[in-house]
Amino acid sequence: METNEQTMPTKYDPAAVEKDRYDFWLKGKFFEAGSDQTKEPYSVVIPPPNVTGRLHLGHAWDTTLQDIVTRMKRMQGYDVLWLPGMDHAGIATQAKVEAKLREEGKSRYDLGREKFLEETWKWKEEYADFIRSQWAKLGLGLDYSRERFTLDEGLSKAVREVFVKLYEKGLIYRGEYIINWDPATKTALSDIEVIYKDVQGAFYHMSYPLADGSGSIEIATTRPETMLGDTAVAVHPEDERYKHLIGKTVILPIVNREIPIVGDDYVDMEFGSGAVKITPAHDPNDFELGNRHNLERILVMNEDGTMNENALQYQGMDRFECRKKLVKDLQEAGVLFKIEDHMHSVGHSERSGAVVEPYLSTQWFVRMQPLADAAIELQKKEEKVNFVPDRFEKTYLHWMENIRDWCISRQLWWGHRIPAWYHKETGELYVGLEAPEDSENWEQDTDVLDTWFSSALWPFSTMGWPDVTAEDFKRYYPTDVLVTGYDIIFFWVSRMIFQGIEFTGERPFKDVLIHGLIRDEQGRKMSKSLGNGVDPMDVIDKYGADSLRYFLATGSSPGQDLRFSYEKVESTWNFANKIWNASRFALMNMDGMTYDELDLSGEKSVADKWILTRLNETIEHVTQLADRYEFGEVGRHLYNFIWDDFCDWYIEMAKLPLYGEDEAAKKTTRSILAYVLDQTMRLLHPFMPFLTEEIWQHLPHQGESITVSQWPAVVPEHTDTEAAADMKLLVELIRSVRNIRSEVNTPMSKQVELYIKTSTDEIASRLEANRSYVERFTNPSVLKIGTDIEAVDKAMTAVVSGAEVILPLEGLINIDEEIARLQKEFDKLTKEVERVQKKLGNEGFMKKAPAHVIDEEREKEKDYVAKRDAVQKRMAELKG
C-alpha cells in the first residue's frame, strides 16, 4: 500500500480517529474465536457487569486490562476467545425496576410476578444495548457471537444442574440461620450488598434480676428491642465474678420470662460487664452460641421490620419506634440504669438504604466445608490457581479456611427460581431439573437464587457445560486468566474456584490478575455521597479512549489502588499527540514508499543502528513484562522508547540524511522510519488500539488490520552494542552542551566554541566518526576533539563518559556582569540556608512541629545548599 500523509490531518483528533473504527474491526470479524483450529487456544471470560446502568471507571479499568492481554495474545498467534456477557444482578436490577414502577404509582404486586418479569426483561434489553455501546467506545475486542447472559436458557440449565447435584450430595439443605435481612425490600442480602456506616447510637446498660432474688447481673446492648427475644445470659466459664451463677436463671425484664445463665468461651471477660444477653434469632454469634447450648430461638420481628406477636404489647410497632418505647418502659421499671453514647458501625442495605437486621429465617444453604477443603487442597498442587500478586493467595486461603455455610435463597422475583417444589397436600419436598409430572399438585418455591450462585458457574456455564462435549467447553476451558478487583475475591473468585473443581474437576482459570480500586485524587473511594465519581464516557469524549486506556493500564502496579487524575489523562493525551506528530513527519518523508520497497539492508548510520538496537531491547522488555501483567512497567518502557529515543533523538537525527543529497541514505532512513514505526505501533496497539490502527493503516503494510498483525520479535542481527555505546556517548555529550547553554542563557541559535577533551584516542575517533551529529545538535563555531586539548581559562565544563566538555565563555557572555549576578544569587541562597538551619536547630520548633513540616524544611535545606554550591562552582569557573 502507498502512504499518503495528506490523509493524516495536522491535528490529532481522538474523536475522528476513533469514529467507525470499532465497526471496521467487527465487520472484519477480527475478534471472533475459532477460525483457525491449528492455533493454540487462549481464553478469558469478562466479569459480567450488572444490567443496572452505566459502566463506571472500575469497569473501564478491568476491561482495559483484559483487552490488553487478549489483543497481545491474538497478535502472538493464539486463537483468542474473549467472551462477553452480563449479569442479571438480582436485587440490584429488581430494585431499579421497582423504583421505576413507584414513579408510575405502581408496585410489583400490582403487576404480579409474570408481568413484573416482562418489565424487567425490557429493562435488561435497554441497558444491555447501552453497555455494548460503552464497550464499543472503549474499543474492547470481544467475541459478540458468544455473548452470554446469566439468565440465558443455557446458563439456567447449568444452574439447575448444579443445584440438583449439590442437593443430591447433601451439600444443599434448607434450614434456619441468621442472615442479613433488608426490611425494606424484604429479602436476604449477601455480605457484599451490606454497606457499613458509622452511626451515633448508644449502649443501654440494664440489670437482669436473678430469679432467686439474690441479686442481678448487668448487661449492655445497642439494640434493646431484641431483648424481647433473649433466651439466655452468657458469661465466661473462667470468670471468677460469675462462675457461681452458671446454671442459675434470671428474669427477663418486661417479658418476665425466666432464662438461664450459661458459660461459654465466646464471651470476652474484659469487655463491658463480662456478661452478654443472648438472642439466637437476631444475632449470628448468639445463634451459634444458642446451638451449642440448645437454646430456644424467639423471633420478635416481622419481615418488614415491625414487631410481631412475640414482642407482646409492642406488636405492630416499627423496630425503632419500639426501641424508644421499650427504653422508656425499662427506665420506669428501674432496670435501665445508664445510657452511654456510642459511635458504631451499622450495616445498611446497598439498594434500599435500610438498616440491615440480623434475622432468623428459613433459607436454602450450601454446605461449604467439603467444597472449601477441595479448593484449599488444589492450592497445594502444581495445577493451582496463580494469584497475581501472590500475596492475595493468603487472603483467599484465609477466607476458605474460615468458611461459613452460604445462604443462597433470595426473596425476589428476578433471578433463577429455585428448582424445588412442595406438594400442595402433603408438603413433601421435591428437587429436580424439571417440575414433577403431576405438576398441578405441586407448588414451586417462590424464592430465587443468590446472583453469586450463577456467577460462580460463569467460566464453564458460558462454554456450554453441562454438555461436556460442547466444542467451546472442550477447546477453551479452563480459561487462562481472570481479571478482577480484590474486593470480590471472596464473593466471586473463591466461589468460581470451588464450583469449577466440583463440577469440572479443574481450576476454572490458570491465573487471577488482581487490581485495586479506583479512587479520586485525594485517595478517597468514589461515591455518590461525595460526588467525586467520574463517568469514563465523559473522559473519552474529552480525551479519547486511547488516553483513558493508557492511563488506566499504566497508572499502578498489580493489586494496588489507582488514583484517577485528569492531569495524568491529559499527559497521556500529550503522549498520543506526540506519537501522531512523529508519525505524520515520518509519513511526509516516505515519498510514497510501498511495503515492497522497504529495505533495511543498506548502509546504516550510528543512529540507525542504535534505534534498531533500542527497538530490540524494548520488544524484549515489553513482552516479558506484559507476560507478567506488569503493565505499569510496560508503559514506562514504551514511553521512554517512543518519546525520548524515537521522537526526540532518532527523528531529529534522521533529518540529516532525509534533507541531504545521498539518495541511498535517504532510502535506508525511510525504511528504518517505517519499520520502527510499524513495530512500535504493534507494541503499543493493545494499549492504544484506535491510534495505532489509524497510523498503521497509513504505513506501508501487509494485512487487513494491526489487530491481527504479528507481535514484534527481537531480530538478533539488528542489535549493535558498539553503535548503542557510541549513541549513548553522543546523547550524553549533546545534553551536557545544552545544559551549559541553558545555565549561561545562551540560545541554540547562537554559535559557541566547543572543545571535547577525550581520555583515549579511541573515544576521540568514535566522536570524530559522528562529528556531523555533534555539529547538528550543538551548533559550534569551532569544534575540536582530541586527547591533547589544553585547559581554557574562564570556561564552563562538564564531564561525560570518557571525555570533558569545555565551552569557553569569552565573547559569549559579559563575564563581570555574570559574576556580579551570580554573587547576588549566592548571597540570597546563603541567607536561605542560614534561615532554614536556624529553624531546624531550634529545639522548640523540632518538638512542636508536625513530622511532615520538619521533613519539608529538611528538603528545603538540601535544595538551597545544592543550588548555592552550584552557583559557587559556576563563579569559580568564570573567575578562571
Curated annotation (Swiss-Prot):
Motif residue range(s): 'HIGH' region: 49-59
GO CC annotation: cytosol
EC category: ligase
Subcellular location: Cytoplasm
Coiled coil regions in record: 809-879
Description of what induces expression: By valine starvation. Is transcribed by itself and in an operon with folC. A GUC triplet (Val, the specifier codon) 190 nucleotides upstream of the initiator codon confers induction upon valaine starvation; replacing it with ACC (Thr) confers induction upon threonine starvation, replacing it with UAA (stop), renders the gene uninducible. Negatively regulates its own transcription; this depends on the presence of the GUC specifier codon.
Recorded GO MF terms: aminoacyl-tRNA deacylase activity; ATP binding; valine-tRNA ligase activity
Pfam families the record matches: Anticodon_1, tRNA-synt_1, Val_tRNA-synt_C
Entry annotated with the keyword Zinc: no
Signal peptide positions (record): none
Gene3D superfamilies the record matches: HUPs, Isoleucyl-tRNA Synthetase, Domain 1, Valyl-tRNA synthetase, C-terminal domain, Valyl/Leucyl/Isoleucyl-tRNA synthetase, editing domain
InterPro entries reported in the protein's UniProt record: aa-tRNA-synth_I_CS, aa-tRNA-synth_Ia, Anticodon_Ia_Val, M/V/L/I-tRNA-synth_anticd-bd, Rossmann-like_a/b/a_fold, tRNA-bd_arm, tRNAsynth_Ia_anticodon-bd, Val-tRNA_synth_C_sf
Major location (coarse): cytoplasm
Any one Gene Ontology BP term: valyl-tRNA aminoacylation
Keyword Acetylation annotated: no
Function comment: As ValRS can inadvertently accommodate and process structurally similar amino acids such as threonine, to avoid such errors, it has a 'posttransfer' editing activity that hydrolyzes mischarged Thr-tRNA(Val) in a tRNA-dependent manner. Catalyzes the attachment of valine to tRNA(Val).
Subunit field text: Monomer.
Family according to the record: Belongs to the class-I aminoacyl-tRNA synthetase family. ValS type 1 subfamily.
The record's note on its domains: ValRS has two distinct active sites: one for aminoacylation and one for editing. The misactivated threonine is translocated from the active site to the editing site. The C-terminal coiled-coil domain is crucial for aminoacylation activity.
NCBIfam families in the cross-refs: PRK05729.1, valS
Protein's UniProt name: Valine--tRNA ligase
Name of the gene: valS
